[in-house]
Each structure stands twice: as structure tokens, then as C-alpha cells.
Design a protein with these regions (language model features):
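Long, internal low-complexity/basic segments
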Residues: 4-8, 14-54, 61, 65, ...
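Active-site segment of extracytoplasmic enzymes that catalyze sulfate/phosphate-ester chemistry
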Residues: 21, 33, 37, 58, ...
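A short beta-strand-to-alpha-helix junction
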Residues: 51-52, 74-78, 95-99, 125-136, ...
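Loop/turn elements at helix/coil->beta-strand transitions in domains of secreted/extracellular proteins
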Residues: 52-57, 87-92, 144-150, 170-172, ...
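Short, solvent-exposed turn/loop segments enriched in Gly/Ser/Thr/Pro and often Arg
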Residues: 70-76, 90-111, 151-163, 177-181, ...
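Formylglycine-dependent
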Residues: 118-120, 125-128, 132-144, 157-230, ...
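Histidine-centered active-site microenvironments of extracellular/periplasmic hydrolases
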Residues: 162-170, 243-247, 284-339, 351
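C-terminal cap/loop subdomain of S1 sulfatases and analogous C-terminal strand-loop tails that border
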Residues: 164, 172-173, 178-181, 305-311, ...
Length: 529
């Protein structure tokens, strides 16, 4: 009963349920770590002597809370993540999106998820969508530059046609699952098996998914990669996303925590612990192969944690699904021993949208998306030489269907607006909050009435973006279409590329775009009348 209840709760969380406002005292500074931004950071950056292209590894946690790592004061044992922080640079103003599919699409394309039709929700197993085939993904650029590319873990960017899968989006090797919320032990979602290697079914039931992710990453590093090339390795862990499941030996490490039907903190802690162990095996392998110094490692979470399942975003407000800081500002660390100074703190604002151009710049390659990239190259900011602010506003959006509302966030410099639009049966309510996040990062003081000019300015930024890109694309679908059944194995039901029409169709907006532009100008608002 407990496991079934947790699965049901997790299903609703994936779909965008349950705003949660979390307040608390700031966690104590972990021993050996400072919460203060490192002064004169640029002077500590090392001059690189090697001419070899660096390897790149992205380690992505799923729903990890801000305070769920040791270096932020957690009691969860994360010695390997802490090691990355000790040997690298903490990015303390790193922003993702409130939910996972938008974060992943932004990272892979360098584009605003609202332009991809993926800003508001996650892709579920019964949805056929994915990122447009017109977009060029980050691993494609690394592959074009001579890198060996691999992905181990959770995809979640389209799974029903061949061109949406990792092997068609720049990855030479893929081992993992295409859906979210796959059972950690039996590897099923909605009774359909979901683990594969390059399109072929993998039957490894009984093995804990996080262990598989770690072991397969080590396998790539030791056996599969072409050692004559640099490599790009993307490891999106499922952990600590629901279903809340862990190995008993890891659960037993946290006797002082208590599991309850809502907020299974003991099991959640064990899931984070297991992910950290997997990261440790990857780090050890890099050391054993003598390639750690020339490998860029980026660790971050795809969104904030969900407190009802045990995550802790203290002292930030809110959590997953929300555009408050607790939902979008995430734990992030970058390590590159040849270049970045150890045990440093960088508070430059960096977005997940910026990762494609930033990592490309660090590696000395071209970020080759054929579409205009919205992300900003923040590599100089990482080195302590660039501007603290990224120069362009960040817009966040989330659809929470059980509450029938959207929540938006606009961050521009020190000012941040959070706007909640409640669609009631007979009317719509709009609540607008304004924060100075440089002085009030925990968003305790609403300044909307004191600074109406900032509310007006940020609202105009949001309105212009929504007018240019009307709310559309993927919406949260918390239940499948009538009659839908999961396939026995998701790897078996992919539509081959030669069976898919190659001409994109964007819907009513594309068909009527000239008429709409004549009527509304270059914004081309979509109306139905």
C-alpha cells in the first residue's frame, strides 16, 4: 500500500501538482565551505598549458533540493558531490526551470523552452511530442568537433519516433530510459518496461536504477569510448525523483529520519546517498585513467526539490513546479582542475539556457544550433571576468493543473516578479509579487506596492514574450488519453524515421501566420473567433 500510494503521489507531482511554500532558517555552513563569494576570483584562475580539447561530463540530478547536499549543510551523506565543490567552483546563482522537460530542452538547444513548445509541462508516456527536428542539440556540436558522445540515464525529450531519441540527437551511445518516473527496481512505467541500449531492450530488472546509471557510466569510460578522442558524457540520473525507492542498506544509514506517507525523508535521503555513490565511482574512474585534470564536470539539478517527498530547499522559498527561488535556483558545481580554482564560490547569474554556448566556449568548439540561441556565453563569468548579470531577462513558467493555474517568473537584474494566474470557474485572478533578490534571496518581502514601475516593466517583458509565443505546445496531462495502454516495452514501439513525414507542421498559428501578422503586427497573436 505504501509503495502504491507513493507512486500515485509521484505521478501527480510529475504532472505539476501541489504548490508548497517552505520557510526555515538557513542551514549552517558545512565544515570546510564558505557561503561567501570568493573575492578576486579571476586572479585565481589557472593558465591552461595543455592544447588537448577537454572532456565534458554533465551530471544531472532530478528534483534535488537546494539544501540536500553536504556543502549546503545537509545531513545526507554526499561526500563525492562535496568533493566536486571542494575541488571546484560552486555556482550559487545557477537557474534551471521549475520542471524537468523544459530544463532538459533548454540545456540541449540553448533556446528558451517557450519557443520549443515545452515551457509549461513534462512529456508523459502517452504524449507523442518532442523537441522539433529543426533544432540541433548540444551533443551534435560536440560530435561535429570530433568528440565521442554518450548518454546514460533519463531522456524525457520525446520517445515515440526515431528522430526524437538520443541516438538521433547527437549521442553515439545511449543506455537508459526514455520516460520519467521509471520504477527503480523493475524498470517499468505504467506497466511498460523502459530500459534500453541504443534502441535494443535491456533486461536488468532487480538492479537499482541509480546503480545502473553509475555502472554504465564507468563502462563507457573504461570500455566503450574511443580513447583517441575527447568525450562528451551526459548522465541524467533519475534520482531523487519519485517513485521514492531506495536500497535497504542505504535507508538504514538514516535512522533518525522518519518516513511518512507524505514526506518519506529517510528513503529520500537514501536515494540522494546512492546517487552520490554513483558519482563517486565516476570520479574514481577518471582518477584511475589519469584524465580528471582535463575533464570539465558540471553537476546541477533540473529544478528545485519537492518538500512533500523529503527534499529541503531551505532557506529558499517554494520548490519544484514554482517560480520562486526554491523551484528554479539549484545546487550547481563545476570542476576543471586545469583551469578553475578549487573551493571557490561564484555568484554570477547563469541559466540552464546558457549551458550550450558556455560549455562550447570552454571546450573551444562552436555552438551550432541552426536556430538563434537565446543562451548567453557565460564562460568569462565562470572565470570571474565577466558581468555578474547575464544581460538578458530570464522568464520562467509552470502549469499546475489541479489548481488550474499558471505561475510565471521574470528575473531581470536584481528585480524578480512572480505572477500567479488562477483560472477560476467564473473569473481569473492574478497575484503579482515583486522581490529584490539581491537583498532578499529568500523572497520574504513583497515590494510590488513600493515599486509599481518595476512591476509594470517586468509585466511588459512577460506580456511581450507571451504575445510572441502564445501559451501552447505541451500542457500537463495528468492522465492518459481514453483507452491508452503502455507498450510492453517502450524500445519496441518507436516509429522509424522513414515512416515519419519530414515536413514540420506547427498548427493553426503557422497556417494563419500571415493573416495574424497583418492584423496584430509582428507579434501575431493567436485568436479563435
Amino acid at each position: 500500500m505504501k509503495r502504491g500510494l507513493l507512486f500515485l503521489l509521484g505521478f501527480f507531482v510529475v504532472a505539476g501538482v501541489g504548490a508548497y511554500f517552505y520557510y526555515g532558517k538557513a542551514p549552517p555552513s558545512a565544515e570546510g565551505f564558505s557561503n561567501e563569494t570568493t573575492p578576486n576570483l579571476a586572479s585565481l584562475v589557472k593558465t591552461r598549458t595543455s592544447t588537448e580539447q577537454p572532456n565534458v561530463i554533465i551530471l544531472l540530478a532530478d528534483d534535488l533540493g537546494w539544501a540536500d547536499v553536504g556543502y549546503h549543510g545537509s545531513d545526507i551523506k554526499t561526500p563525492n558531490i562535496d568533493r566536486l565543490a571542494k575541488e571546484g567552483m560552486r555556482l550559487e546563482r545557477f537557474y534551471a526551470t521549475p520542471i524537468c522537460t523544459p530544463t532538459r530542452s533548454a540545456m540541449m538547444t540553448g533556446r528558451d523552452p517557450i519557443k520549443l513548445g515545452l515551457a509549461n509541462a513534462v512529456l508523459m508516456a502517452w504524449q507523442d511530442g518532442g523537441v522539433s527536428l529543426d533544432e540541433k542539440f548540444m551533443p551534435e556540436s560536440f560530435k561535429d568537433a570530433g568528440y565521442d558522445t554518450a548518454m546514460i540515464g533519463k531522456w524525457h525529450l520525446g520517445h515515440t519516433i526515431e528522430q526524437h531519441l538520443p541516438n538521433a540527437r547527437g549521442f553515439d551511445h545511449f543506455y537508459g530510459h526514455v520516460n520519467t518516473q521509471v520504477d527503480y527496481f523493475n524498470h517499468e512505467f505504467a506497466k511498460g518496461h523502459d530500459f534500453q541500449e541504443n534502441g535494443k531492450i535491456v533486461d536488468n530488472k532487480g538492479e537499482y536504477a541509480t546503480d545502473v546509471h553509475g555502472d554504465q557510466s564507468v563502462r563507457f569510460l573504461t570500455e566503450l569510448r574511443d580513447k583517441t578522442k575527447p568525450f562528451f558524457l551526459y548522465v541524467p540520473f533519475l534520482a531523487p525523483h519519485s517513485p521514492i525507492e531506495a536500497k535497504q542498506e542505504d535507508i538504514d544509514k538514516y535512522p533518525r529520519r522518519i518516513d511518512t506517507p507524505v514526506g518519506p525523508k529517510k528513503t529520500y535521503a537514501a536515494m540522494v546517498d546512492s546517487m552520490d555513490q554513483a558519482i563517486g565511482r565516476i570520479l574514481d574512474t577518471l582518477d584511475e585513467q589519469g584524465i580528471a585534470d582535463n575533464t570539465i564536470i558540471l553537476f546541477y539539478s533540473d529544478n528545485g526539490g519537492y518538500p512533500n517527498f523529503g527534499a529541503d530547499n531551505t532557506p529558499l522559498r517554494g520548490g519544484k513546479l514554482e517560480t520562486f527561488e526554491g523551484g528554479i535556483r539549484v545546487a550547481a558545481v563545476m570542476r576543471w582542475p586545469e583551469v578553475l580554482p578549487a573551493n571557490t564560490v561564484n555568484d554570477a547569474v547563469i541559466s540552464v539556457i546558457d549551458l550550450f554556448p558556455t560549455l562550447a566556449s570552454a571546450a573551444g568548439i562552436t555552438a551550432g544550433n541552426v536556430k538563434e540561441i537565446d543562451g548567453v556565453d557565460r564562460w568569462q563569468a565562470v572565470l570571474g571576468k565577466g558581468d555578474h548579470w547575464r544581460g538578458k531577462p530570464l522568464i520562467f513558467t509552470s502549469n499546475i493543473p489541479l489548481y488550474n493555474h499558471f505561475q510565471y517568473g521574470v528575473l531581470d537584474g536584481k528585480w524578480k516578479m512572480v505572477q500567479t494566474v488562477n483560472h477560476l470557474r467564473r473569473e481569473t485572478e492574478v497575484e503579482t509579487l515583486l522581490f529584490d533578490v539581491s537583498a532578499d534571496p529568500n523572497e520574504k518581502s513583497d515590494l510590488a506596492t513600493k515599486h509599481p514601475e518595476q512591476v509594470k516593466r517586468l509585466t511588459a517583458i512577460l506580456d511581450d514574450r507571451l504575445a510572441e509565443h502564445p501559451v501552447g505546445g505541451t500542457f500537463v496531462q495528468i492522465s492518459p488519453h481514453p483507452g491508452w495502454r503502455a507498450p510492453k516495452d517502450y524500445a519496441d514501439v518507436v516509429l522509424p524515421a522513414d515512416k515519419v513525414n519530414q515536413a514540420p507542421h506547427e498548427g493553426f498559428g503557422a497556417v494563419a501566420s500571415k493573416f495574424l501578422q497583418q492584423r496584430y503586427g509582428d507579434k501575431g497573436k493567436i485568436i479563435y473567433e
